[in-house]
Structure formats: structure tokens, C-alpha cells
């Protein structure tokens, strides 16, 4: 079942498997479709939440938006450095934090999200398994669960008419 030497196809993507099932991709049409879909989603969210997510301003409507004090953004989310506000992909502008939202935040409002981890060696007494300790169940193997562990098995009763 080998193909003849003249019918060998060249893989256009090199060694990777690559198929175009529906023809070439029109990138301009794709970007227009994505932009239209995004605009529709933004408009739907704007009408639902009475908030303009593009300019980050509240709108008149069912909801009354107010600033929550003391919940400032962590430093992780604030833009820093010479590439401030630049997208890593393509160099376009990415949405930054609005000055209206950051107004009134101070250094003490930021939450410190740093964590530290230290390894603690086990002592010989705990490794042997003290009663009630975490090493108590290490020696036993767990059996594999089956369907009957979750559902009780029942016998099906079949009533048939007896012949006279």
C-alpha cells in the first residue's frame, strides 16, 4: 500500500502536520470578523452593566457604580518600565489602568502578594508514623473505586406470566 514515487505530496509546513481544510485564510476578513464580534460583546456588556469598559466610566442606568476604598490594585497589575502600556505581541497599545480608577490609591492600599516557601526535613519519629499523624495512612494502598461504590447495585425483578 505504498504510493508511487510520482504521487508523493510535498508537505508545505515542513515536518509538521499541517492541513487547510477550507482553503487559504483571509487574515483581513478574519480581523474584521473578530473586531465586529468584540464590538458586539462590548456593546452587550455596556448595556447589561451600565459601564463603558473602553473608557472605564460608569453610565446612567440600573446600577449605581461607586469606588471601593482600600482595595487598590497590587503592584503586579500596574504597568511599569519603559514598555509601559505596550502589548507584547505586535507592539500595539494594550488597555491600561484608568487614572479614574487609580485616583486616591496610596502605597499602603496595595496588597503584598509575595509568598515564601521553606522545606522542613522530617524527623525520624514522624517518618515512622506517629499515631494520628499524617503518616498514618502511608503504608496502606487504596483500592480502585468501582461504579458500585457510588451506586448501589440492585437486582432487576422480571415478572412473567406463568403458563397453565
Curated annotation (Swiss-Prot):
It holds the Pfam family CDI. Coiled coil: none annotated. Keywords: Acetylation, Cell cycle, Cytoplasm, Metal-binding, Nucleus, Phosphoprotein, Protein kinase inhibitor, Ubl conjugation, Zinc, Zinc-finger. Phosphorylation of Thr-145 by Akt or of Ser-146 by PKC impairs binding to PCNA. Phosphorylation at Ser-114 by GSK3-beta enhances ubiquitination by the DCX(DTL) complex. Phosphorylation of Thr-145 by PIM2 enhances CDKN1A stability and inhibits cell proliferation. Phosphorylation of Thr-145 by PIM1 results in the relocation of CDKN1A to the cytoplasm and enhanced CDKN1A protein stability. UV radiation-induced phosphorylation at Thr-80 by LKB1 and at Ser-146 by NUAK1 leads to its degradation. Ubiquitinated by MKRN1; leading to polyubiquitination and 26S proteasome-dependent degradation. Ubiquitinated by the DCX(DTL) complex, also named CRL4(CDT2) complex, leading to its degradation during S phase or following UV irradiation. Ubiquitination by the DCX(DTL) complex is essential to control replication licensing and is PCNA-dependent: interacts with PCNA via its PIP-box, while the presence of the containing the 'K+4' motif in the PIP box, recruit the DCX(DTL) complex, leading to its degradation. Ubiquitination at Ser-2 leads to degradation by the proteasome pathway. The keyword Zinc applies. Residues 17-24 are annotated as: Required for binding cyclins. Residues 76-164 are annotated as: Disordered. The keyword Phosphoprotein applies. Interacts with HDAC1; the interaction is prevented by competitive binding of C10orf90/FATS to HDAC1 facilitating acetylation and protein stabilization of CDKN1A/p21. Interacts with MKRN1. Interacts with PSMA3. Interacts with PCNA. Component of the ternary complex, cyclin D-CDK4-CDKN1A. Interacts (via its N-terminal domain) with CDK4; the interaction promotes the assembly of the cyclin D-CDK4 complex, its nuclear translocation and promotes the cyclin D-dependent enzyme activity of CDK4. It is found in: Cytoplasm; Nucleus. It comes from the Eukaryota. The modification N-acetylserine is found at residue 2. Induction: Activated by p53/TP53, mezerein (antileukemic compound) and IFNB1. Repressed by HDAC1. There is a cross-link at residue 2 (Glycyl serine ester (Ser-Gly) (interchain with G-Cter in ubiquitin)). This is Cyclin-dependent kinase inhibitor 1. A zinc finger (C4-type) spans 13-41. Residues 53-58 are annotated as: Required for binding CDKs. Expressed in all adult tissues, with 5-fold lower levels observed in the brain. Residues 153-164 have a biased composition (Basic residues). A motif (PIP-box K+4 motif) lies at residues 140-164. Plays an important role in controlling cell cycle progression and DNA damage-induced G2 arrest. Involved in p53/TP53 mediated inhibition of cellular proliferation in response to DNA damage. Also involved in p53-independent DNA damage-induced G2 arrest mediated by CREB3L1 in astrocytes and osteoblasts. Binds to and inhibits cyclin-dependent kinase activity, preventing phosphorylation of critical cyclin-dependent kinase substrates and blocking cell cycle progression. Functions in the nuclear localization and assembly of cyclin D-CDK4 complex and promotes its kinase activity towards RB1. The modification Phosphothreonine is found at residues 80, 145. Belongs to the CDI family. One of its GO terms (biological process) is negative regulation of cardiac muscle tissue regeneration.
Amino acid at each position: 500500500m505504498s504510493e508511487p514515487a510520482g504521487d508523493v505530496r510535498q508537505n508545505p509546513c515542513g515536518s509538521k502536520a499541517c492541513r487547510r481544510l477550507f482553503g487559504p485564510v483571509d487574515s483581513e476578513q478574519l480581523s474584521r470578523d473578530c473586531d465586529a464580534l468584540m464590538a458586539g460583546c462590548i456593546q452587550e456588556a455596556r448595556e447589561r452593566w451600565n459601564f463603558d469598559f473602553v473608557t472605564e466610566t460608569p453610565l446612567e442606568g440600573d446600577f449605581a457604580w461607586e469606588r471601593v476604598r482600600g482595595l487598590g490594585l497590587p503592584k503586579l497589575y500596574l504597568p511599569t518600565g519603559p514598555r509601559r502600556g505596550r502589548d507584547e505581541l505586535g507592539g500595539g497599545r494594550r488597555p491600561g489602568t484608568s487614572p479614574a480608577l487609580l485616583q486616591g490609591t496610596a502605597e499602603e492600599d496595595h496588597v503584598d502578594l509575595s509568598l515564601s516557601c521553606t522545606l522542613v526535613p522530617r524527623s525520624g519519629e514522624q517518618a515512622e508514623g506517629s499515631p494520628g499523624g499524617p503518616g498514618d495512612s502511608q503504608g496502606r494502598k487504596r483500592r480502585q473505586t468501582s461504579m458500585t461504590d457510588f451506586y448501589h447495585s440492585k437486582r432487576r425483578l422480571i415478572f412473567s406470566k406463568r403458563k397453565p
